């Protein structure tokens, strides 16, 4: 567990960072849902449905060691979280010997704690974990608000495209 002090406008916060566990699946799910709601990504019923499927998925990924997450707490309140998904990946010209890629997801900070460097701290935790595992390529999808944070950390815009099959099964 890591503790650090953050001084903002004469306010001292005693924050604690810890690794996410299976017990945090509900919190991670709530933060993910709030992250998408903040970005107006989808209507509430769609986010509810996503959350219903996400929680058992993230439990499984944590149990299998494929999702490594961190939680920041202020006293007894969990205020921020993020995760690193470990993906099997084909060797690529960006990393010709690597067989894994990292994907940072669920970076969320409660509104009253934003603009204090917490998203950056969580992203750094994810990047450090990727380095410990020898993962050299890490991707993420950034909101408009988050993009400057990630660019400051060295992320660049890529040419990745996305296709979503919207036909009903």
Predicted regions and their residues:
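Conserved beta-strand-loop-alpha-helix junction that forms the acyl-donor binding cleft
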Residues: 138-149, 163-166
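Conserved acetyl-CoA pyrophosphate-binding loop and the N-cap/start of the following alpha-helix
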Residues: 113, 117-125
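Conserved beta-strand in the GNAT
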Residues: 71, 77-86, 103, 108
């Amino acid at each position: 567990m890591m503790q650090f002090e953050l001084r903002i406008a004469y306010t001292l916060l005693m924050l604690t960072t810890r690794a996410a566990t299976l017990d945090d699946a509900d919190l991670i799910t709530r933060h993910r849902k709030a992250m998408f709601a903040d970005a107006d990504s989808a209507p509430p019923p769609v986010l509810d449905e996503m959350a219903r499927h996400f929680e058992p998925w993230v439990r499984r990924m944590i149990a299998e060691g494929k999702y490594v997450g961190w939680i920041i707490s202020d006293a007894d309140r969990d205020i921020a979280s993020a995760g690193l998904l470990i993906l099997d990946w084909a060797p690529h010209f960006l990393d010709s010997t690597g067989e894994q890629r990292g994907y940072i997801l669920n970076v969320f900070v409660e509104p009253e704690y934003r603009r204090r460097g917490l998203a950056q701290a969580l992203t750094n935790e994810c990047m450090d974990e990727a380095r410990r595992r020898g993962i050299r390529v890490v991707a993420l999808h950034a909101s408009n608000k988050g993009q400057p944070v990630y660019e400051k950390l060295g992320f660049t815009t890529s040419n990745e495209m996305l296709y979503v099959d919207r036909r009903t099964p």
